[in-house]
Curated annotation (Swiss-Prot):
Gene Ontology molecular function: any one: tRNA (guanine(46)-N7)-methyltransferase activity
Family annotation (SUPFAM superfamilies): S-adenosyl-L-methionine-dependent methyltransferases (SSF53335)
Record: residues binding substrate: 122, 154, 191-194
Catalytic residues of the enzyme: 118
Name listed for the protein in its UniProt record: tRNA (guanine-N(7)-)-methyltransferase
Catalytic activity: guanosine(46) in tRNA + S-adenosyl-L-methionine = N(7)-methylguanosine(46) in tRNA + S-adenosyl-L-homocysteine
Family recorded in the similarity comment: Belongs to the class I-like SAM-binding methyltransferase superfamily. TrmB family.
Transmembrane segments: none
Pathway(s) it belongs to: tRNA modification; N(7)-methylguanine-tRNA biosynthesis
Binding, S-adenosyl-L-methionine: 44, 69, 96, 118
E.C. number(s) listed in UniProt: 2.1.1.33
Species: Bacillus thuringiensis (strain Al Hakam)
Length: 217
């Protein structure tokens, strides 16, 4: 995806620092204070233009959401949604998710969403996939005991790789769909990419995976 440069982006982000948290590492362990309540916290890694996080936060005011996106020219679009209609249970982070364990304390997050992540199809780029074992380890570090990952993609190769990676890591697959939009799954909230790809007839894959609280026998 080619990103269009937006020279105003950083100024906009700095102006609305109560929406886009500038130094998330300083908030580690204190995110409930940021939100001002004790509600569970769900994060999306690679939140893009923010439609999924925004719609989730609007539909579930009893849950706090944090969207993480490293590209400034993209996260500013998510910010614009918040400027237009503020949601008290949604914050954004404009940083690389590789630093996830610096942003959050151990057990501070209840769920991780991965939606239409870059498939990085070349073998030499395997370690960049957001379901590679080092990322799975980072998610486990910040999640509560028995925390979950919810993953969606239209890329069959990435989906198959992710199932294998999660299984090898010892995770328990609690929900699996090979064709989400033709399944009985209720309450699906689409991303921008999901709407685009499904309208072209692409099959959408979805899995929910849970970290085990006890070692595998």
């Amino acid at each position: 995806m080619r990103l269009r440069h937006k020279p105003y982006a950083m100024d906009r982000i700095n102006e609305y620092s109560h929406f886009v948290i500038g130094n998330p590492e300083e908030r580690a362990g204190n995110w409930k204070e940021v939100f001002g309540n004790e509600q569970p916290i769900h994060i999306e890694v690679g939140t893009g233009r923010g439609r999924f996080m925004y719609d989730m936060a609007k539909a579930n005011p009893h849950i706090n959401y944090i969207g993480i996106e490293k590209f400034t020219s993209v996260v500013v679009d998510a910010l614009d949604k918040l400027i237009e209609e503020e949601l008290p249970n949604l914050k954004l982070i404009n940083k690389d998710a590789e630093d996830l364990t610096v942003f959050f304390a151990k057990g501070e997050i209840d769920r991780v969403y991965l939606n239409f992540s870059d498939p990085w199809p070349k073998k030499r780029h395997t370690k960049r996939r957001l379901t590679y074992k080092t990322f799975l380890r980072n998610y486990e570090e910040v999640l509560v005991e028995g925390g979950e990952i919810h993953f969606k993609t239209d890329n069959q190769g990435l989906f198959e790789y992710s199932l294998m990676s999660m299984a090898e890591y010892g995770m328990l697959l609690t929900y699996l769909s090979l064709d989400l939009h033709n399944s009985d799954f209720e309450g699906n909230i689409m991303t921008e990419y999901e709407e685009k790809f499904s309208s072209k007839g692409h099959r959408i894959y979805r899995v929910e995976a849970k970290y085990r609280t006890e070692p595998m026998q």
